[in-house]
Amino acid sequence: MFFPTLLAVEAAEKGGLFDLDATLPLIAIQFLLLVAVLNSLFYEPVTRAIDSRNDYIRTTQAEAQERLDKAVSLTRQYESEISQARLQAQQVIAEAEAAAARIRSEKLAAVQAEIQQKLEAARLQVEQEKQAALEQLQQQVDAIAAQITQKLLGSAR
């Protein structure tokens, strides 16, 4: 507290605010020494630490960007592979459905042909039985007609 007033009293005694004596260059030299000491002891280590931290951040950020790019690339590749697999699965399903439809139609055609064959065989059998029955009936009619004729001729005689 007394120090500023003492300076003011000294300045008033000498006659001016600034006297050009050895104190100004001494203060300038002290200031330059302080700057040099602070520069070597504080600013350079802090600057090196900041620079190394910035380098670390830059390299980490570059690595992260590379990993992100790789992840995006792998995602696209996997999505492409998945879509190709889905297309292949759809093709396999379509082929299986077509094969099943073809097998079903072949079996249906075979069954229909077998049924048609059996129907034709049954129709032929019925036709043969009908012909046999008609022949037997004709024989019976002929026999009855012969008996009737004999009775008529026998009674007419």
Swiss-Prot record:
Give the transmembrane region(s). Answer: 22-42
Highest taxon of the source? Bacteria
Spell out the molecular function terms from Gene Ontology: proton-transporting ATP synthase activity, rotational mechanism; proton-transporting ATPase activity, rotational mechanism
What keywords are annotated for this sequence in UniProt?
A: ATP synthesis, CF(0), Hydrogen ion transport, Ion transport, Membrane, Thylakoid, Transmembrane, Transmembrane helix, Transport
Topology versus the membrane, per the UniProt entry?
A: Single-pass membrane protein
Where does this one sit in the cell? Cellular thylakoid membrane
Q: Does the keyword RNA-binding apply?
A: no
Q: Name one GO cellular component term.
A: plasma membrane-derived thylakoid membrane
One Pfam entry for this protein is: ATP-synt_B
Q: Does the keyword Membrane belong to this entry?
A: yes
What job does the chain carry out?
F(1)F(0) ATP synthase produces ATP from ADP in the presence of a proton or sodium gradient. F-type ATPases consist of two structural domains, F(1) containing the extramembraneous catalytic core and F(0) containing the membrane proton channel, linked together by a central stalk and a peripheral stalk. During catalysis, ATP synthesis in the catalytic domain of F(1) is coupled via a rotary mechanism of the central stalk subunits to proton translocation.
Which NCBIfam families does this one have?
PRK07353.1 (NF005607)
* Assigned protein family: Belongs to the ATPase B chain family.
The record's note on quaternary structure and interaction partners says: F-type ATPases have 2 components, F(1) - the catalytic core - and F(0) - the membrane proton channel. F(1) has five subunits: alpha(3), beta(3), gamma(1), delta(1), epsilon(1). F(0) has four main subunits: a(1), b(1), b'(1) and c(10-14). The alpha and beta chains form an alternating ring which encloses part of the gamma chain. F(1) is attached to F(0) by a central stalk formed by the gamma and epsilon chains, while a peripheral stalk is formed by the delta, b and b' chains.
This chain belongs to which protein, by name?
ATP synthase subunit b'
Q: Which organism is it from?
A: Synechococcus sp. (strain JA-2-3B'a(2-13)) (Cyanobacteria bacterium Yellowstone B-Prime)
The gene it comes from is atpF2
